[in-house]
Structures are given as structure tokens and as C-alpha cells.
Amino acid sequence: MAHAFFLGVDVTPADGDGAPDVTHTLFEKSTEGAGEPATYRLNRIRDHADVASADDLADHLQGLVADQPYIGRTSLIVNRGAAFGAALVGALEDRGLDPVAATLTDEGGATAGAPDEVGIHLGGGDVLRRFVNLHRDGRLRLENHATEAASRLARDVQALSERLDEIDGDMEALGETQTDGLSFDPGATHITSAALAVWLGSERSFDPSQRLKTSPQTDAGA
């Protein structure tokens, strides 16, 4: 059985002088054998409502990886859309963690960032649809967690799945192909951090040294 770990971090911009809302979510990608579809199991999810600085959070994430030998080669992806997110990318890079810097857009598709960075521009709705489709296919494992953050993630993913069923059913009845429809909520850090982690996992093999694909995808086939 092959394993790999992927950590997604999302940030909601702070209101006024308050601290930003931050969530990090860790998924384990595994497969039973060659040719078998990968599954993604929630390892942990945590909300941070009182982060003092990007450096403090980077220290915490570095400690999380260092204290868990079995996830020591975890691949990270950070939503850098907010100023705090961009600062966190820099702080993680300073610590040698080499995160993927994601910029979420309202447009569809995915494009690589600048040649000199590990970055990506992603359609937020596409990332969300891929995540929900994996849940619909039974390839997400969100159970066996007692925290409120994990319970909220499971509830909201199920609600999104039911909404997507309705959307796709309406489109089928009209004889049309569904291209969008899910509403991407920039404030739902628990959903975004999880969706980013799983997106990165679906774009990379079980070799943690692998870079992003030259032509990243947004469907749910990986």
C-alpha cells in the first residue's frame, strides 16, 4: 500500500485589527495497489482563531511535520490570496518547507504560476467540485474524528454533495452539460483547506519530491 500526506492551509482576511481565521487540514492519500484509485483520509483538521503572526503559524506547522515522523515528507499548499496567506508562504519557504502557493480565482481551469515559483492559479469552483466529486465517489474518508472542526467539515461536504446532485439532475433534465453551479465561499476555511490538500494530492504521485504537473487538471479523475 502506498501512502502520501498533503496539508492544505486557508486564510480568511482579518477584520480591522483582529487576527485572521486560519484552518489547516491534513489528508493521507493511499492506494491498495497499482491501477487502483486513490482514497483520501482526513488525518486532522484544526481552526486557528488567534494566530499572532505568519511566523508563529509557520513554526506550528513546521513542528507538526517534525513531530510526526510518518508525515515528515508532507506536501503543503497554502491559499496566498490574503496578505497573511502570502506572508505564510514566505515564512514556510524560509523554514525549508517548500509550499505550493495557490491563488484562487472565479474563473475555471488551472494554470501554473511563474517559472521561478512553486505556484498555481486555480478556479475555486473547479477545486470545490473535484473535492465534492471524490466524496460522491466514496473516495474521501472523513469519519472517526471527534472534533467540531472535523464534524463541521463532514456535514458541509455532505450538504455540498447533495446540492451538486440537485444541480446535475437539473442539467440532465434540461439536456445540458453542467460546468459550474457550486458556490465557492471564501470564508469557509475548513472546506477550502481540505479541498486544496486533496487537489494537491490528486496532482502529485506518491513521490513527495515530485513537482506539480506541467498541465494541472481540475477534474476528479486522479
Residue ranges of model-derived segments:
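RNase H-like, metal-dependent nuclease domains and their acidic two-metal-ion catalytic environment used
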Residues: 1-102, 140-222
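Short alpha-helix plus adjacent loop in nuclease-associated cores
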Residues: 101-148
